């Protein structure tokens, strides 16, 4: 009986190690969602998914890009893409009240993709996701920088604020990152 238990424990440990090994370090974190107590553990929630990660703000000239990001989210969700917004006040254009920031995202722009609670996205104080992205591909120089991460965890591209969600270059990177394309 104890041998069977030991075998089961070893099998469970090896499977757990495999799951965490396939998750890049920069995504192996949990963060709280905007204006919520709910958290997302990125590796568990988005294993095998491509990600479009964007640093967002409510009062920026690029805030209108929420519309295009929502369109990308709706267009590619069934193909394995998740758009993730990371609210940030690093450029002093995010509302200090999370409820008001959430109102901009979810009511004004009718965003349905996840947006995370306000956190730093650049420098030594960057949240762990943006620390990994920034170290590997460069930190955001403004709001609405976009990072495309493949379903295997590779950073496919980093796009500046000026790259519109419907740009050919961004769309090409997204399509290359989708699960069928990157496996």
Identify the meaning behind each predicted range.
Residues 15-30:
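N-proximal helix/coil linker or "cap" segments that precede and/or mark the start of modular domains
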Residues 4-13:
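Sec-dependent N-terminal signal peptides
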């Amino acid at each position: 009986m104890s041998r069977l238990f030991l075998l089961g424990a070893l099998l469970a440990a090896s499977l757990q190690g495999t799951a965490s090994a396939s998750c890049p370090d920069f995504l192996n974190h949990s963060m709280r969602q905007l204006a919520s107590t709910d958290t997302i553990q990125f590796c568990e929630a988005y294993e095998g998914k491509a990600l479009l990660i964007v640093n967002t703000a409510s009062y920026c000239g690029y805030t209108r890009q929420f519309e295009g990001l929502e369109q990308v989210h709706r267009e590619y969700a069934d193909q394995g893409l998740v758009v993730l917004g990371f609210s940030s006040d690093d450029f002093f254009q995010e509302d200090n009240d999370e409820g008001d920031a959430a109102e901009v995202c979810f009511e004004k722009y009718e965003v349905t993709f996840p947006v995370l609670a306000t956190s730093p996205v650049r420098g030594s104080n960057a949240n762990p996701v943006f620390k990994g992205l920034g170290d590997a591909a460069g930190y955001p120089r403004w709001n609405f920088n976009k990072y495309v991460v493949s379903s295997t965890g590779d950073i496919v591209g980093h796009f500046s604020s000026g790259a519109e969600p419907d740009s050919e270059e961004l769309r090409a990177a997204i399509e290359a990152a989708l699960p069928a394309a990157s496996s």
